[in-house]
Amino acid sequence: MVSGHSLSRRTMLGGVFALSAASTARAQDLTKASIALLRLSSSGPIFIAQEKGWFKEAGLDLTLKDFQAAAQVPLAVVSGDADLGVTAFTAGFFNLAAKGGLVVVAAQSAERPGYQLNVIAVTNAAWDAGVRSVKDLAGKRVAVTTVGSSVHYSLEVVAKKHGVDTKSLTIVALQTIPNMVAAFKGGQVDAAVFPITTFRQVEAEGSGKPIAYVGDEVPWQLGAVFTSPKTIADRRPLVEKFLVGYRRGAAAYHEAFGKRENGKLVPGPNYEEMIGILSSVLKQPPALVAAGLPFIDPDGRLDVGDIYKQVAFWQSTGQVARDADPKAFIDLSFVQGHFNVPGK
Protein backbone atom coordinates (compact mmCIF):
# COMPACT_ATOMS: atom_id res chain seq x y z
CA MET A 1 0.00 0.00 0.00
CA VAL A 2 1.30 3.42 -0.91
CA SER A 3 0.82 6.08 1.75
CA GLY A 4 -0.75 9.45 0.91
CA HIS A 5 2.46 11.12 2.04
CA SER A 6 4.60 9.07 -0.38
CA LEU A 7 2.15 9.65 -3.21
CA SER A 8 2.04 13.40 -2.71
CA ARG A 9 5.83 13.52 -2.48
CA ARG A 10 6.19 11.50 -5.68
CA THR A 11 3.60 13.69 -7.38
CA MET A 12 5.46 16.80 -6.25
CA LEU A 13 8.83 15.46 -7.41
CA GLY A 14 7.31 14.40 -10.71
CA GLY A 15 5.99 17.93 -11.15
CA VAL A 16 9.40 19.41 -10.41
CA PHE A 17 11.09 17.11 -12.90
CA ALA A 18 8.45 17.91 -15.50
CA LEU A 19 8.97 21.64 -15.02
CA SER A 20 12.74 21.16 -15.18
CA ALA A 21 12.42 19.14 -18.38
CA ALA A 22 10.11 21.76 -19.86
CA SER A 23 12.57 24.53 -18.96
CA THR A 24 15.42 22.55 -20.51
CA ALA A 25 13.38 22.00 -23.65
CA ARG A 26 12.58 25.71 -23.85
CA ALA A 27 16.25 26.56 -23.39
CA GLN A 28 17.13 24.14 -26.19
CA ASP A 29 14.53 25.82 -28.41
CA LEU A 30 16.20 29.23 -28.03
CA THR A 31 18.28 30.47 -30.96
CA LYS A 32 21.82 31.29 -29.86
CA ALA A 33 23.06 34.71 -30.97
CA SER A 34 25.66 37.29 -30.03
CA ILE A 35 25.87 41.06 -30.30
CA ALA A 36 28.96 43.28 -30.27
CA LEU A 37 28.55 46.56 -28.40
CA LEU A 38 30.12 49.20 -26.20
CA ARG A 39 29.08 49.35 -22.55
CA LEU A 40 27.47 52.78 -22.91
CA SER A 41 24.00 54.17 -22.25
CA SER A 42 23.36 54.17 -26.02
CA SER A 43 23.22 50.36 -25.74
CA GLY A 44 20.56 50.78 -23.05
CA PRO A 45 17.66 49.02 -24.81
CA ILE A 46 19.80 45.88 -25.10
CA PHE A 47 20.78 45.90 -21.43
CA ILE A 48 17.15 46.48 -20.41
CA ALA A 49 15.77 43.73 -22.65
CA GLN A 50 18.46 41.29 -21.48
CA GLU A 51 17.79 42.04 -17.81
CA LYS A 52 14.01 41.73 -18.25
CA GLY A 53 14.29 38.44 -20.15
CA TRP A 54 12.68 39.85 -23.29
CA PHE A 55 15.20 38.33 -25.69
CA LYS A 56 14.50 34.88 -24.24
CA GLU A 57 10.75 35.52 -24.54
CA ALA A 58 11.39 36.29 -28.22
CA GLY A 59 13.20 32.94 -28.59
CA LEU A 60 16.78 34.18 -28.41
CA ASP A 61 19.67 33.18 -26.14
CA LEU A 62 21.72 36.37 -26.55
CA THR A 63 25.36 36.79 -25.55
CA LEU A 64 26.65 40.36 -25.15
CA LYS A 65 30.22 40.91 -26.35
CA ASP A 66 31.83 44.05 -24.95
CA PHE A 67 34.37 46.08 -26.90
CA GLN A 68 36.40 49.13 -25.93
CA ALA A 69 36.36 51.10 -29.19
CA ALA A 70 33.60 51.81 -31.70
CA ALA A 71 35.78 50.70 -34.61
CA GLN A 72 36.01 47.17 -33.17
CA VAL A 73 32.25 46.56 -33.19
CA PRO A 74 31.57 46.42 -36.96
CA LEU A 75 34.79 44.46 -37.45
CA ALA A 76 33.46 41.80 -35.07
CA VAL A 77 30.33 41.44 -37.23
CA VAL A 78 32.27 41.36 -40.51
CA SER A 79 34.65 38.70 -39.14
CA GLY A 80 31.81 36.56 -37.80
CA ASP A 81 32.82 36.98 -34.15
CA ALA A 82 29.34 38.43 -33.51
CA ASP A 83 26.01 38.01 -35.29
CA LEU A 84 24.87 41.57 -34.68
CA GLY A 85 26.36 44.89 -33.67
CA VAL A 86 25.25 48.24 -32.33
CA THR A 87 27.38 51.39 -32.33
CA ALA A 88 27.84 54.85 -33.81
CA PHE A 89 28.32 55.53 -37.50
CA THR A 90 31.86 56.32 -38.66
CA ALA A 91 33.63 56.68 -41.98
CA GLY A 92 35.16 53.26 -41.34
CA PHE A 93 31.72 51.75 -40.75
CA PHE A 94 30.46 53.07 -44.09
CA ASN A 95 33.49 51.68 -45.93
CA LEU A 96 32.92 48.21 -44.45
CA ALA A 97 29.23 48.41 -45.33
CA ALA A 98 29.97 49.58 -48.87
CA LYS A 99 32.21 46.54 -49.38
CA GLY A 100 29.27 44.26 -48.57
CA GLY A 101 30.21 43.48 -44.98
CA LEU A 102 27.36 45.14 -43.06
CA VAL A 103 23.63 45.82 -43.31
CA VAL A 104 21.84 48.40 -41.14
CA VAL A 105 18.49 47.10 -39.83
CA ALA A 106 17.33 49.47 -37.04
CA ALA A 107 18.16 52.64 -35.13
CA GLN A 108 20.29 53.05 -32.07
CA SER A 109 20.89 56.51 -30.57
CA ALA A 110 20.43 59.91 -32.19
CA GLU A 111 21.37 63.49 -31.40
CA ARG A 112 18.19 65.45 -30.61
CA PRO A 113 17.39 68.83 -29.02
CA GLY A 114 17.18 68.59 -25.25
CA TYR A 115 19.50 65.57 -25.08
CA GLN A 116 22.89 66.81 -23.93
CA LEU A 117 24.82 63.85 -25.24
CA ASN A 118 27.94 65.46 -26.74
CA VAL A 119 29.26 68.95 -26.14
CA ILE A 120 31.80 71.28 -27.73
CA ALA A 121 33.73 72.80 -24.84
CA VAL A 122 36.56 75.32 -24.59
CA THR A 123 39.35 75.63 -22.06
CA ASN A 124 39.30 78.40 -19.50
CA ALA A 125 42.21 80.07 -21.29
CA ALA A 126 40.33 80.02 -24.61
CA TRP A 127 37.18 81.34 -22.91
CA ASP A 128 39.15 84.17 -21.30
CA ALA A 129 40.67 84.94 -24.71
CA GLY A 130 37.18 85.46 -26.14
CA VAL A 131 36.28 82.02 -27.54
CA ARG A 132 32.62 82.04 -26.49
CA SER A 133 30.86 80.48 -29.51
CA VAL A 134 31.40 78.04 -32.36
CA LYS A 135 32.21 80.96 -34.69
CA ASP A 136 35.15 81.83 -32.46
CA LEU A 137 36.80 78.44 -33.06
CA ALA A 138 38.38 79.52 -36.37
CA GLY A 139 42.14 79.17 -36.09
CA LYS A 140 41.93 77.12 -32.88
CA ARG A 141 43.11 73.63 -31.97
CA VAL A 142 40.18 71.26 -31.38
CA ALA A 143 40.51 67.74 -29.96
CA VAL A 144 38.56 64.75 -31.27
CA THR A 145 39.05 61.01 -30.78
CA THR A 146 39.88 59.94 -34.33
CA VAL A 147 39.47 61.38 -37.80
CA GLY A 148 36.33 59.89 -39.34
CA SER A 149 34.67 59.22 -35.98
CA SER A 150 31.21 60.29 -34.83
CA VAL A 151 32.95 62.85 -32.60
CA HIS A 152 34.72 64.30 -35.65
CA TYR A 153 31.45 64.35 -37.61
CA SER A 154 29.73 66.24 -34.78
CA LEU A 155 32.39 68.95 -34.98
CA GLU A 156 32.08 69.16 -38.76
CA VAL A 157 28.28 69.56 -38.88
CA VAL A 158 28.08 72.06 -36.01
CA ALA A 159 30.93 74.13 -37.48
CA LYS A 160 29.22 74.15 -40.87
CA LYS A 161 25.96 75.37 -39.32
CA HIS A 162 27.80 78.37 -37.92
CA GLY A 163 29.69 79.11 -41.13
CA VAL A 164 33.04 77.91 -39.84
CA ASP A 165 35.24 76.14 -42.40
CA THR A 166 36.88 73.29 -40.51
CA LYS A 167 39.94 73.76 -42.72
CA SER A 168 40.52 76.84 -40.58
CA LEU A 169 40.71 74.61 -37.49
CA THR A 170 43.55 72.39 -36.40
CA ILE A 171 41.76 69.11 -35.67
CA VAL A 172 43.84 67.13 -33.20
CA ALA A 173 43.06 63.38 -33.15
CA LEU A 174 44.05 61.98 -29.75
CA GLN A 175 42.56 58.44 -30.05
CA THR A 176 41.01 58.19 -26.58
CA ILE A 177 38.82 60.29 -24.28
CA PRO A 178 41.42 60.25 -21.45
CA ASN A 179 44.03 61.61 -23.88
CA MET A 180 41.60 64.37 -24.89
CA VAL A 181 40.95 65.29 -21.26
CA ALA A 182 44.69 65.45 -20.54
CA ALA A 183 45.35 67.69 -23.56
CA PHE A 184 42.37 69.89 -22.70
CA LYS A 185 43.43 70.37 -19.09
CA GLY A 186 47.06 70.79 -20.08
CA GLY A 187 46.35 73.54 -22.60
CA GLN A 188 47.61 71.60 -25.65
CA VAL A 189 44.24 72.27 -27.32
CA ASP A 190 41.77 75.15 -27.14
CA ALA A 191 38.60 73.07 -27.41
CA ALA A 192 37.28 69.52 -27.58
CA VAL A 193 34.17 67.52 -28.41
CA PHE A 194 33.37 65.54 -25.27
CA PRO A 195 30.70 63.04 -24.22
CA ILE A 196 28.60 64.91 -21.68
CA THR A 197 29.45 62.56 -18.80
CA THR A 198 33.16 63.23 -19.36
CA PHE A 199 32.66 66.97 -19.67
CA ARG A 200 30.57 67.20 -16.48
CA GLN A 201 33.56 65.83 -14.57
CA VAL A 202 35.91 68.28 -16.31
CA GLU A 203 33.48 71.14 -15.62
CA ALA A 204 33.13 70.16 -11.96
CA GLU A 205 36.89 70.54 -11.63
CA GLY A 206 36.60 74.07 -13.05
CA SER A 207 38.54 73.18 -16.19
CA GLY A 208 36.29 74.30 -19.06
CA LYS A 209 33.14 75.90 -20.41
CA PRO A 210 30.47 74.53 -22.83
CA ILE A 211 29.78 76.53 -26.00
CA ALA A 212 27.45 74.16 -27.91
CA TYR A 213 25.47 70.96 -27.35
CA VAL A 214 25.51 68.92 -30.56
CA GLY A 215 21.89 67.71 -30.40
CA ASP A 216 20.58 71.24 -29.88
CA GLU A 217 22.62 72.45 -32.85
CA VAL A 218 22.27 69.66 -35.43
CA PRO A 219 20.07 66.61 -34.81
CA TRP A 220 21.45 63.52 -36.58
CA GLN A 221 21.24 59.73 -36.63
CA LEU A 222 24.18 58.76 -34.46
CA GLY A 223 24.09 54.97 -34.51
CA ALA A 224 22.37 51.80 -35.64
CA VAL A 225 21.77 48.10 -35.15
CA PHE A 226 23.40 46.09 -37.92
CA THR A 227 24.29 42.60 -39.02
CA SER A 228 25.98 40.88 -41.96
CA PRO A 229 24.35 40.08 -45.31
CA LYS A 230 25.12 36.40 -44.64
CA THR A 231 23.21 36.43 -41.35
CA ILE A 232 20.17 37.95 -43.07
CA ALA A 233 20.36 35.42 -45.90
CA ASP A 234 20.94 32.34 -43.73
CA ARG A 235 19.43 33.24 -40.34
CA ARG A 236 16.82 35.94 -40.87
CA PRO A 237 14.64 34.69 -37.96
CA LEU A 238 17.57 35.40 -35.62
CA VAL A 239 17.52 39.08 -36.63
CA GLU A 240 13.73 39.22 -36.34
CA LYS A 241 13.79 37.68 -32.84
CA PHE A 242 16.49 40.09 -31.74
CA LEU A 243 14.49 43.08 -32.92
CA VAL A 244 11.39 41.91 -31.03
CA GLY A 245 13.38 42.04 -27.78
CA TYR A 246 15.33 45.14 -28.77
CA ARG A 247 12.21 47.15 -29.57
CA ARG A 248 10.64 46.18 -26.24
CA GLY A 249 13.81 47.47 -24.58
CA ALA A 250 13.74 50.66 -26.68
CA ALA A 251 10.09 51.28 -25.78
CA ALA A 252 10.81 50.84 -22.05
CA TYR A 253 13.89 53.08 -22.35
CA HIS A 254 11.85 55.76 -24.12
CA GLU A 255 9.05 55.56 -21.55
CA ALA A 256 11.57 56.15 -18.76
CA PHE A 257 13.86 58.70 -20.39
CA GLY A 258 12.14 60.05 -23.51
CA LYS A 259 10.38 63.14 -22.17
CA ARG A 260 12.14 66.51 -22.03
CA GLU A 261 10.91 69.90 -20.84
CA ASN A 262 13.16 72.95 -21.26
CA GLY A 263 16.08 70.65 -21.99
CA LYS A 264 15.60 68.70 -18.76
CA LEU A 265 14.68 65.04 -18.35
CA VAL A 266 11.18 64.41 -17.02
CA PRO A 267 11.29 60.89 -15.51
CA GLY A 268 8.71 58.42 -16.79
CA PRO A 269 6.68 56.00 -14.62
CA ASN A 270 9.30 53.24 -14.96
CA TYR A 271 12.27 55.56 -14.42
CA GLU A 272 13.57 54.11 -11.16
CA GLU A 273 13.61 50.54 -12.47
CA MET A 274 15.26 51.48 -15.77
CA ILE A 275 17.90 53.79 -14.29
CA GLY A 276 18.64 51.04 -11.76
CA ILE A 277 19.27 48.52 -14.54
CA LEU A 278 21.57 50.89 -16.46
CA SER A 279 23.40 52.00 -13.32
CA SER A 280 24.14 48.37 -12.46
CA VAL A 281 25.24 47.39 -15.98
CA LEU A 282 27.33 50.52 -16.60
CA LYS A 283 28.75 50.51 -13.05
CA GLN A 284 28.02 54.23 -12.71
CA PRO A 285 25.95 56.19 -10.17
CA PRO A 286 22.38 56.82 -11.37
CA ALA A 287 22.94 60.60 -11.52
CA LEU A 288 25.90 60.16 -13.89
CA VAL A 289 23.96 57.73 -16.10
CA ALA A 290 21.02 60.16 -16.22
CA ALA A 291 23.33 62.98 -17.38
CA GLY A 292 24.27 61.15 -20.58
CA LEU A 293 21.14 59.42 -21.85
CA PRO A 294 20.73 59.75 -25.64
CA PHE A 295 17.50 59.84 -27.60
CA ILE A 296 16.53 56.36 -28.84
CA ASP A 297 13.46 55.86 -31.01
CA PRO A 298 11.00 53.57 -29.18
CA ASP A 299 10.37 51.54 -32.35
CA GLY A 300 13.94 51.41 -33.66
CA ARG A 301 13.12 53.67 -36.62
CA LEU A 302 15.97 55.28 -38.55
CA ASP A 303 16.36 58.77 -40.01
CA VAL A 304 17.34 57.21 -43.32
CA GLY A 305 17.99 60.43 -45.20
CA ASP A 306 20.47 61.52 -42.56
CA ILE A 307 22.53 58.37 -43.14
CA TYR A 308 22.68 59.27 -46.84
CA LYS A 309 23.83 62.74 -45.79
CA GLN A 310 26.61 61.33 -43.60
CA VAL A 311 27.88 59.08 -46.38
CA ALA A 312 27.90 62.03 -48.81
CA PHE A 313 29.87 64.13 -46.33
CA TRP A 314 32.56 61.50 -45.79
CA GLN A 315 32.73 60.95 -49.55
CA SER A 316 33.36 64.68 -50.01
CA THR A 317 36.35 64.44 -47.67
CA GLY A 318 37.73 61.37 -49.44
CA GLN A 319 37.30 59.11 -46.40
CA VAL A 320 34.49 57.00 -47.89
CA ALA A 321 34.61 55.47 -51.37
CA ARG A 322 32.69 57.35 -54.06
CA ASP A 323 30.76 54.22 -55.05
CA ALA A 324 29.37 53.68 -51.53
CA ASP A 325 25.57 53.54 -51.84
CA PRO A 326 23.53 53.66 -48.60
CA LYS A 327 20.55 52.09 -50.34
CA ALA A 328 22.61 48.92 -50.79
CA PHE A 329 23.39 48.52 -47.08
CA ILE A 330 20.21 49.72 -45.34
CA ASP A 331 17.46 47.09 -45.07
CA LEU A 332 14.15 48.79 -44.27
CA SER A 333 12.16 45.54 -44.12
CA PHE A 334 12.72 44.65 -40.45
CA VAL A 335 11.21 47.80 -38.91
CA GLN A 336 8.24 49.73 -40.26
CA GLY A 337 7.85 53.51 -40.37
CA HIS A 338 11.42 54.73 -40.85
CA PHE A 339 11.76 58.49 -41.25
CA ASN A 340 12.99 60.65 -44.11
CA VAL A 341 13.36 57.81 -46.64
CA PRO A 342 14.78 59.15 -49.93
CA GLY A 343 12.44 58.66 -52.87
CA LYS A 344 9.31 58.37 -50.71
Each model region followed by its residue ranges:
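Secondary-structure end/capping motifs
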Residues: 233-321
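N-terminal secretory signal peptides and thylakoid transit peptides that target proteins
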Residues: 2-19
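Conserved C-terminal helix/tail region of periplasmic/extracytoplasmic solute-binding proteins
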Residues: 307-344
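Short, glycine-/small- and polar/acidic-enriched structural segments
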Residues: 28-164, 171-174, 190-196, 213, ...
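Short helix-loop capping/hinge motifs at secondary-structure junctions, enriched
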Residues: 125-133, 230-239
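Sec/Tat signal peptide C-region and signal peptidase I cleavage site
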Residues: 23-27
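Periplasmic-binding protein-like
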Residues: 110-119, 203-231, 235, 243-246, ...
